[in-house]
Swiss-Prot record:
Annotated positions binding S-adenosyl-L-methionine: 112, 132-137
Annotated localization: Cytoplasm
Keywords: Cytoplasm, Methyltransferase, S-adenosyl-L-methionine, Transferase, tRNA processing
Protein name: tRNA (guanine-N(1)-)-methyltransferase
Gene that this sequence comes from: trmD
Organism: Gloeobacter violaceus (strain ATCC 29082 / PCC 7421)
The protein's role, per its UniProt record: Specifically methylates guanosine-37 in various tRNAs.
EC number: 2.1.1.228
SUBUNIT field: Homodimer.
Keyword S-adenosyl-L-methionine: yes
Family that this chain belongs to: Belongs to the RNA methyltransferase TrmD family.
Primary localization class, coarse: cytoplasm
């Protein structure tokens, strides 16, 4: 998969892309990540990418010309999605991450900034609009990193044990069951006996019940009414 990041702050991504899973995925050829700065496509010598909003109002709005030019300069690998990271977008869900990882060969991530982007970018350039939640960040760089991390770990060749992905939170619309490791007794807090029993059917049943209980308590919105 190719992932293109369109951002005014390329340096924001330098360290994260050189660490841990993302670094291994890039080095292993699982994904190719490129960064493009819209300032390189500005029409004036000041590299202007924003302007005041028509009709008045606070803040500055990202101009359409540099963003369109930046995206249009990229190679096209079909199928491709152009994703605008914005608080007005649909909340990011695991099911959408799975869809992106499975259905697309190229993702173009548009990182908004300042007061927002010209509406024509939303209407005629972006194919999707995604938000991390009901809060506002300085720009789209942090959401872009979250999206990249969530997608890349789903690509074949990134995570060694694919079975571990199937038991995580939000797979099957349930939160993950509690996890324990050694020691079995820490400060009097003991690992549940069933996990020490070696009885795989009982362990599977316990984990399923824990998933349901934890989801009911913390995220009942994930469950169907009859659950």
């Amino acid at each position: 998969m190719r992932i293109d990041i369109v951002t005014l702050f390329p340096e924001f991504f330098v360290s994260p892309l050189q660490c841990s899973l993302l670094a291994r995925a890039i080095a292993g050829g699982v994904c190719n990540i490129a960064i493009t700065n819209p300032r390189d496509f500005a029409a004036d010598r000041y590299r202007t990418v924003d302007d005041t909003p028509y009709g008045g109002g606070a803040g500055m709005v990202l101009k359409p010309e540099p963003l369109f030019a930046a995206v249009e300069s990229l190679p096209i690998i079909a199928p491709r999605a152009v994703i605008l990271l914005t608080p007005q977008g649909r909340p990011l869900k695991q099911v959408f991450l799975r869809s992106l990882a499975a259905d697309y060969a190229q993702l173009v991530l548009l990182c908004g900034h300042y007061e927002g982007v010209d509406e024509r970018v939303r209407a005629h350039l972006a194919t999707h609009e995604i938000s991390l939640g009901d809060f506002v960040l300085t720009g789209g760089e942090i959401p872009a990193l979250a999206l990249i991390d969530g997608i890349v770990r789903l690509l074949p060749g990134t995570v060694g044990n694919r079975a571990s992905l199937e038991s995580e939170s939000f797979e099957d619309n349930l939160l993950e069951y509690p996890q324990y490791t050694r020691p079995a007794d820490f400060r009097g807090w003991q690992v549940p006996e069933v996990l020490l029993s070696g009885h795989h059917a009982q362990i599977a049943h316990w984990r399923r019940e824990q998933q349901l209980t934890r989801t009911r308590e913390r995220r009942p919105d994930l469950l169907p009414p009859e659950a």
